[in-house]
Amino acid sequence: MQFGITTSKIDEIGLITRAENLGYDFCWVTDSQMIRSNPWAVLALAAQQTRSIRIGTGVAVAGLRLAPVTANGIATINRLAPGRTFLGIGTGNTAMRAMGQPPMGIKAFEEYIRVVQALLKGEETDYTLNGVTHPIQFQNQDFKYIDVENPIPIHVSGFGPKTQVLAGKIGDGLITGIPRGGTIPQALENVKKGAKKVNRSLHSFETFALVNILMLKPGQKLTDELVIQQCGSAIMANVHFVVDWVKESGNPPPDYILPFWDEYLDFHKKRDYKRKHMKLHQSHYSYLDPDEAKFITPEIIKAFTIAGQPAEMVEQIKELESYGLDGINFIAPLEQQYRLIEDFAYNVISKM
């Protein structure tokens, strides 16, 4: 099992170097322009201040920039950290919805990845913009402005069946989430469907999951304020995703959110209509909105997190590994991130 952290704050590159020293395998840098620092700037600093930890976007949002711009961005980082750079890429949950815009559609997303993939191989490929199509290719590759000689794996973010199938069809890996991406066996079955469509092998394919973790100390209870603050922002980020997903898809909410679904919708409807999209995602994986703390109950914590004493967490992670999961990543609340990545490394990773 591989372990990763997530960060995005330009002046806290020390968190990444600390994670590297603690034995973490990889780091995701988020791409959410209305909330976080610019991912390319963060990655450039991380590349220069680390030596072994793998770094990349987790995830770059296709709707925010042209495909050649994304390819150039990650290839530039690869020049600074050759052989340990990857590109996580998605349609855009928070990044698009925080502007009141929908994520990119699946057909456009597949074409976007195709273009990025070809460019990162140094190839010429047809590219269409504003209805006009021309061949494009990175020029003057021998000048080393970028690095497309060392492979850059593309990990496709897939929290639903369609994008999970797409990951299996064209990606080098899948990034899903627990619980909102379904179970790992379900996700991998979708990946296999995608691979079967193009008759490709999944021999080197890797699957990663964004998880919510809660490591309890002796005597701690799920109702303790410190416990709620530790896992609350991650849980509510999942809730915010489901609110938009149900609204856009027309699908019923998943079972794990039903215990407080109606109550949360009533709460959300009372917000300023014009700014609902901003308020919904403002606290995204950073802090627990005080007005939302009431929704974090012991039952909800159990449904949304890998929780328990360290030994119990080890067993839960080993079970996920047995299903075929290759790596997990978590996002710690901003004010607790150093302590949590250290506690997790000392008490869980070291026992794996």
Predicted regions and their residues:
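Alpha-helix-loop-beta-strand connector modules within alpha/beta enzyme cores
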Residues: W40-T57, Y112-V115, L119, F344-M352
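Active-site mouth loops of central-metabolism enzymes
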Residues: M1-I10, A60-P68, V148-F159, I213-L216, ...
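An alpha-helical appendage that flanks or caps ligand/catalytic pockets
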Residues: P102, I106-F143, E189-E319
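Hydrophobic faces of well-ordered beta-strands that scaffold small-molecule active sites
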Residues: F3-T7, C27-V29, R54-G58, T85-I89, ...
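Glycine-rich, proline-tolerant flexible connector loops at the mouths of alpha/beta enzymes
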Residues: F26-Q49, V61, N93-M96, I178-G181, ...
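Conserved, mostly hydrophobic/aromatic
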Residues: G23, A46, I77, V116, ...
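Short, acidic/polar
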Residues: S8-A19, G73, G158-L166, V227, ...
